[in-house]
Structure formats: C-alpha cells, structure tokens
Amino acid sequence: MGRKFCVGGNWKMNGDKASIADLCKVLTTGPLNADTEVVVGCPAPYLTLARSQLPDSVCVAAQNCYKVPKGAFTGEISPAMLKDLNIGWVILGHSERRAIFGESDELIADKVAHALAEGLKVIACIGETLQEREAGQTEAVCFRQTKAIADKVKDWSNVVIAYEPVWAIGTGKTASPEQAQEVHAALRKWFTENVSADVSAAIRIQYGGSVTAANCRELAAKPDIDGFLVGGASLKPEFIQIVNARQ
C-alpha cells in the first residue's frame, strides 16, 4: 500500500478570529485532493473555532502540548485537553520550539510518547541548522533527533516525521528537490536499520523548508517525500495548490 500524501499547514503565532474564519472558508471551498491528508496547525486560542468551521476532511493540530496529563505547569496544555476539544493532532519538536524555547531532544521525545499514548496523532519535526549542514552534520543531527524519539516510541502508526532544514525556513532558501530527497532517503534507511523495515516502508516523511506553489510539484514527485509541512504559504490561498501538488 502506498503512503498517503500528507500536507500540514503550520499557522504559527498568526491570525485572529476574522482571518482564521477566512482561512477556513478557503480550505472548505478548496477543492482539496481527496487522496491527500490535510492537517492545519492552529494557534491554541483558535483551535475550537477552526475545528468548528472546517470540514471533517481537514484535520486540526495544536502546535505544542506537554508530556503529562495535568498538574502545576502554568501555561501548558495537555493532550487530554486537546482530545476534549476534538483536536486529533499535534505538531511537536518544531525548530522554533527547539531554538527559541530551548526544548531538548529528550523533552520532545517525552512529549511525542505521551501525546501518542493519549491517542493523538503527531507530526514530529527534525532538522539541521545552516552551521550543521555546512559542517557536514545533516545526517548525524537528523539521526540523533530521530533516535531520541525512537527510544521512547514503539508504535509509529500515528507519527508523521517532518524534515525541516532549519536553514531553509522563512529564509527563502530551499533545499533542492535532490537535496531533500537525499535526506528523506537517508532517514528511511535509518528506520530500516534501527526500527524495522515495515515502519520504514510505512512512515510518512514530510519536507518542511520554504515550500511554495512554485516548487511543490517537483518536490512531491520525489519517491521519499510523502508530503509537506508548510509555514508562511499555509496562510495564503496558494496553500490549496500545495495540498494538490500530487494531482
């Protein structure tokens, strides 16, 4: 069975009630390729608004959640709370969480494991900085981040990996389709050697570095690219074209 193409839109800390309602209208009108799974990462205050205004065919994700069900963790939200709001997905380990908020590989792995245990689906992000790429450490960094998650996760059926070359996020720089495919293929090989051939064949690996309507089709044609995690472009009507990159 082929891997179902999965496109995530990460709205980050953007939007208000009016603009999110507008985005929901764009997504509802589409048309969206029925063979592509679509997930939008919405700011926490607007999760219920987005869920209420989007068709069931579009999934809604939180952009973060904590590693325990409840307690004295001011400002955090738990997977149980997201489930209570009918939110089925969460984005974890995004490069901005790692860089700006200091989240470690281990914390992210704990969050992923807990979210899965609570019944959420997870987009787990990994990727290297420009310094790391220029030092030839791309694979070492991606494998280290993936191994941290693999040490805590046994069932991968509800995990999508998002490879984000950090140097290509919001910079207008893009990995070439060949560069992206090379890392995706290396990650799949890592899963074969360190998890299992079955997981390697089934797991979806999204590409997440400055994806636009202009470059999405060429990227989508690569054999190991199973979707995208889209930042800025997910706030614009061109997101529809990115969702439909395989049509």
UniProtKB/Swiss-Prot annotation:
PROSITE patterns: TIM_1 (PS00171), TIM_2 (PS51440). The active site is at 94 (electrophile), 164 (proton acceptor). InterPro entries: Aldolase_TIM, TIM_sf, TrioseP_Isoase_bac/euk, Triosephosphate_isomerase, Triosephosphate_isomerase_AS. Substrate binds at residues 10, 12. One of its GO terms (molecular function) is triose-phosphate isomerase activity. One of its GO terms (cellular component) is cytosol. Keywords: Gluconeogenesis, Glycolysis, Isomerase. Pathway: Carbohydrate biosynthesis; gluconeogenesis; Carbohydrate degradation; glycolysis; D-glyceraldehyde 3-phosphate from glycerone phosphate: step 1/1. Transmembrane segments: none annotated. GO terms for biological process: gluconeogenesis; glyceraldehyde-3-phosphate biosynthetic process; glycerol catabolic process; glycolytic process. Its EC number is 5.3.1.1. It is an enzyme of class 5 (isomerase). It catalyses: D-glyceraldehyde 3-phosphate = dihydroxyacetone phosphate. Pfam families: TIM. Coiled coil: none annotated. Belongs to the triosephosphate isomerase family. Homodimer. This is Triosephosphate isomerase. It comes from Culex tarsalis. The lineage of its organism: Eukaryota, Metazoa, Ecdysozoa, Arthropoda, Hexapoda.
